[in-house]
Amino acid sequence: MNKKTLMVCGLIGLSLSLQAQTKNGGIDKQMMQKIVAGHSSASNRALSNAIATNSIDNLARNFRKAGGLDTHFSVETTKQNIHDQKSSGRCWLFSGMNVLRSNFARMHKDTLHVEFSHVYLSFHDQLEKSNLMLQGVIDNAKKPMNDPIVQFFFKNPITDGGTFCGVADLVDKYGLVPMEAMPESYSAENTSRMASIISSKLREYGLELRKMVANKKSAAAIKARKTEMLGDIYNILVLSLGEPVKTFQYAFKDKNGNNVGKPQTYTPETFRDAVLGKKLNGSFIMAMNDPRREYYKTYEVEYDRHTYDGHNWKYINLPMEDIAKMAIASLKDDTKMYSSYDVGKQLDLKRGYLDLDNFDYATLFGTKFPMNKAERISTF
């Protein structure tokens, strides 16, 4: 049997397979009749007209939640300026900086305030994540392209999201600088295009590194080429975010914004030591509520970190009741508690308010959404 015969046989087999799939699993006419039955009522037509010309959220908004919000809190922490992450995924970094500057104000009995540069750590975060991706590709280069770990690196080479573990690793490694020393840039506040460009380069570089491993290039040659690649990424970051400062002059300020003492010369490392007085790693724990897994045990997510030589996302799994007690105790101690949520669900953007009953999508569409938290996490 020649190649042409094999190809014809293959096409016939594929055709028969597709016919079988359509017959058994496709939407046939009889099924379509059942699907569309009962959807032409007057009430459905009215809803269709409304939904076609209005925002789904506006129509599903729960009017019972439209009253004024009670902004009184029985326990409050030291007040600070509010910072806006704009169109970026750096909520983890902004929250982490909020905790650090709150701790600084508390250490000085609210007599001194400081504002940290977000873009300084964002720069190093993106460079470190680029190295994490490239080194991860090297480490797994002998695995096929369809291996889950290899796909993990190539599918999302870099993001600007993260956890407090990333804050700790970056601050401990690169220090801190005040906002005045390195202000936000356009690409820091609008990260999507820069991330897309860097991701494209990382995919290109990842394939090249896999070829180098396949061609049995030496470890030294591979490391040298990776270093050149990171130099290109560094250049993109410098042009987009600005070059990280090495030294700067700074005078601390009181809560009214007035300088306290004369400006002094700092490096990012000496400034970090001045405001924190200690390394962050080893000074905190991460708690998580994941009802899929056994409580009161510690879990670690491999490669879910910001730096190759840093710490994975590691957490103790606790019931929400325990986490709530920890949060209250932290607030009573005037210590802000870093926390993260899936704010894409039931968030009223206009009011800045999260509530499970903000929007009633089930009633609007005549259906139910019965999945519990464990099921939602398992299937996202």
Regions found by a protein language model. Give the residues of each.
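N-terminal regions that are enriched for targeting/export leaders
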Residues: 22-81
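Active-site-adjacent substructure of cysteine-protease-like catalytic cores
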Residues: 87, 153-154, 200-202, 321-380
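Helix N-terminus capping/helix-initiation residues
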Residues: 28, 55, 117, 266-267, ...
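Alpha-helix boundary/interfacial micro-motifs
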Residues: 14-16, 20, 106, 141-142, ...
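Short linear motifs at secondary-structure transitions and domain/linker junctions
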Residues: 49-51, 57-59, 65-67, 94-98, ...
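Compositionally biased, low-complexity repeat tracts
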Residues: 6-9, 21, 273, 278, ...
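Active-site nucleophile-adjacent alpha helix/oxyanion-hole segment immediately C-terminal to the catalytic cysteine
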Residues: 68-280, 284-299, 305-338
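Bacterial Sec-dependent N-terminal signal peptides
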Residues: 1-23
